[in-house]
Amino acid sequence: MVNGYLYTGPLPLGSVVAHNCGAAGLFSDKVHPEVILEAHEVEGLYTLTVTIGDSVQIFEGPVSSMGRRQIGQALLRYLREYQGLPAEAPWGTMVGVRPTKLLHKYIDTYGSVHAATRHIRDEFSVSMEKLATLGAIGEYQRPFLSDTDDKKVSLYCGIPFCDTRCVYCSFPYGLYQDYAGKSQFLRALTRDIEDMKAIIQSYNLTVDTLYMGGGTPTVLKDEDFHQVLKQLSLLVPEGHEFTVEAGRPDSVNPTKLRSMLALGVNRISINPQTMQDDILRRIGRGHSVRDIDELLQYVKNNTSLAVNMDFIAGLPNQTMPNMIENMDYVCQNLPENVTIHTLALKRGSPLYDLHMEDDIPEEHLVAEMVQYDKERLEAAGYVPYYLYRQQYMRGQLENIGYTLPGKACEYNIQIMEERQSILSMGPGSSSKWMRAPEYRQLKQHMPKDVDVYYETIDALLEKRHRICERFWEVV
């Protein structure tokens, strides 16, 4: 197996090369690359030379978006074969593209889900099984995406802290207990939320959904959590979708749950990732299976909150019996939503830095787990309702959200399909302003560094106001 690559050549082709090398499990490595890729552009023709040891392969194509795609597709097949993997992955050569976002674009163009999936099959060689899942999700999502009123928005509030770091996580979140600037962060976040309230009122916006994510929002102290939640509750109309990512069961208690219920939260995410204590310890979760079950049972017996549960296929040393146990638990308890993630080996994560990749199950085993989950969940009455893919995912697979009928999380659909403006608060969050029919974006990214966030909050809010004025007052 080869792991590192070095590319030199035209930048437009380099972006395509990077996506396809990532899909084949390779990382950029300028020091000790095992794969050397050299590209040249001469008289309207790209030539890409790939050298792996004594093996040399040359790919050519016209200097155009189609030519770059063709070279990328051929490169991906070659690298997968070199790695001893099937040349054609389930998603074919679809790399660097959100499948459902492309599907909806093609539905707009060609008029039906059937026509759209046919074009995707022809263009990317996607398997019939994945096309069927993609089409079903597109059909389910379409009613959520039909409203083109650009005064309807969703909101996101990010709390960029956890109390431990999972081995697969590459996000630059800090440990809350170690952070010295808590009061400055909370003051800046308060200003951010108050400013968002003013924007909503100034432009007469309707908030469809609000998602409080992270990190782990429930890592905040009870009183701080209540105050932030109270401010957020003023932004979302009563009865509209209001989610709190309570991902770590050890960070949630009855006091926080009472705050959620009193302030209009109607959905939470409880994320076990797996239901085996030995794997939980190995991946750094910091909680037990018992913690998960006690929280879920408390929520079911004492609240009306809808529940999402996240699981990951491909964790270190995970086996099919482990996944069967996970799905047994889901089917016994029937949370409203279940999200099945495929492990992505990300540079910057402890999993990558500690060279634990040898502990990750083989690609075909992860694919079997994902397929098993699909069959068990659909047999239990769940339907797939959103999907996305990431670079470096095991088996070049996908993450899929499943829902019981009528219980889908609309925010998940809107954030993935990018057909509604999503305005965000907090460090590391991103706002995107969208308008039909082009759905082109205006964007603002808040700094990931919490110190920079609170030190520059005035300038950040001024910039957000300028973008809002440009978007809603100049049409």
Regions found by a protein language model. Name each.
Residues D150-L186:
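Canonical Radical SAM [4Fe-4S] cluster-binding loop centered on the CxxxCxxC motif
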Residues P217, Y392, G428-S431:
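Short, glycine-/Ser/Thr-/acidic-enriched flexible segments
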Residues L48-V50, C157, I268-I270:
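Short beta-strand motif preference
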Residues K152-S154, T209, E241, N337, ...:
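Beta-sheet entry/capping signal
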Residues Y82-E88, D108-L155, Y203-N204:
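N-terminal [4Fe-4S]-dependent radical SAM core
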Residues M1-K101, K105-S112, G401, P405-V475:
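Radical SAM enzyme core and accessory elements
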Residues Y173-Y372:
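Conserved non-cysteine loop/helix-boundary elements of the Radical SAM core domain that shape
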Residues G348-M425:
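A C-terminal junction/extension of Radical SAM enzymes
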